[in-house]
Each structure stands twice: as C-alpha cells, then as structure tokens.
Amino acid sequence: MLSAGVIAVDSRPTGWYGVSQAMPRVSEFFGIAIYMYWFDHQRHQAPHFHARVAGEEAVFTLHGSCIDGDLGSRATRLIVEWCQERGAELEEAWAAAAAGKEIPWIAPLR
C-alpha cells in the first residue's frame, strides 16, 4: 500500500478503453485499486473513476453507481461505502483530473 500523497501510475501501454496514457492510482483498499484518467470527462459524461480487483475492471460514478463493468457484490459494496466516506475528496480529485492537474491520493476505506 502506498503512503498518503504518493500517486502510483498504471504503466500499461493502453488503458481499459484503448487510450494510450497513464492512469494514476488514487486509492487502494481491500485489494481494490482506484484509478482516474486525466481529461476523462469526455469519454463518460458523469464524473467517475475506474476500479480494478482480481483482474476485473469497472467504472463507477463518484457516488458509487457502477456505469460499466462488474466487480461483484462484495467489491461493489466496499466501493459504495468508500464513496460515501470520501465524497468531497473524490469531487476534488475529479476536478483535478478533468483539468489535467495532479490528482491527490484519497485515503482508503476505514
């Protein structure tokens, strides 16, 4: 697990949607990695993040609604709980990502 303030970057040559860009990891908890793309507001209309667990990927709104993919009920429940705890931080991170600025690390689920 990373310490607060440290951003990990997914080094895959192309993202889940075939976009060739780095996708910073903004949080991680219970084996779930949370990522945000810079300038990703053009691909999905709603503010969102990408989640990965056990080789599966999904896209969630900042309120925890799954809009693409499926991570199963346990991971989805944990993500919804995390969104409720960290709503303001998610909004700040989304604004930074949409503007192409440094995306802050968001504390994991407690």
Whereabouts are the PLM-identified features?
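Short, charged/polar N-terminal "headpieces" of proteins
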Residues: 15-45
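A short, structured beta-strand/loop element
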Residues: 37-75
